[in-house]
Amino acid sequence: PEPFKQVYYYYPHGKNASRNYTQSNADKDDMDRQFIEKNACRYFYNFESCRDKLQYLFANEPDPTGTIDSIISYLMDYGHPFGPSVTTWEEFFKALNSVTIPGSTTLQGTNIQLASWKKFARIMRKFQSEDLFVDKGHEITDKSDLALDLFDNMTPNDVKVIDIAQLDPFMQGFVFGDVIQQVVERMSAKDKNTPDKIVIFVDELNKYASTDVPKSSPILRHLLDVAERGRALGIILFSVEQFRSAIHERVKGNCANSAYGRT
């Protein structure tokens, strides 16, 4: 056996210079070598690349009335004051603040209740200082659209490693949701540049497809799609979790192979 030869690493953008401006606990010498050999880059999310992905931050947030979903749709439709001129995170949060003022004309124009906007804003503000949400990277080679870059120049036997280990659990889910959506979309509409098969390795699948995950979760929806149509699409999901019983029944029911053991 020998190491894979065609491996490319994606490290989450960070502010720590001693860690190559990443949020990673990978070996520093390994990272240095990978960057020098151009086998690695940092990834980040500017607002423009993130507008249609915010739903993944709310994947585990119960939304029985669909209010959060309505707000996200409003943002994706460039509703006022989140029009095309809002292109940075600073502009987004400024616009968000304007709709959380009771009685404001901006709020009234959205036709969405103040309480719903406040709930959405409260959750979004937790990520206002997130190092992954920046308008530009540390270097010009940093990637602002991870999911799209994964498919650029993809060749057979490529291995793409996306480091999310040190990220907040919400951010881990966000990145995973972004990637799994792109994989499903690409494999559902194959062209000559699309690989025949893609194998996805993910640890702790129970974070995204457990019996406790809200039914409205977009990540769960993608995973159920993979579990039920993966063979036809050419997507193979390989996952590890501590308790199989905690995994969604439709995921377990479509599992082709299982391995059990103790640690």
Predicted feature descriptions by range:
Residues 1-225, 232:
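P-loop NTPase motor domains
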Residues 218-263:
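Conserved ATP-driven motor cores of ASCE-family P-loop NTPases powering translocation/secretion/packaging/pilus
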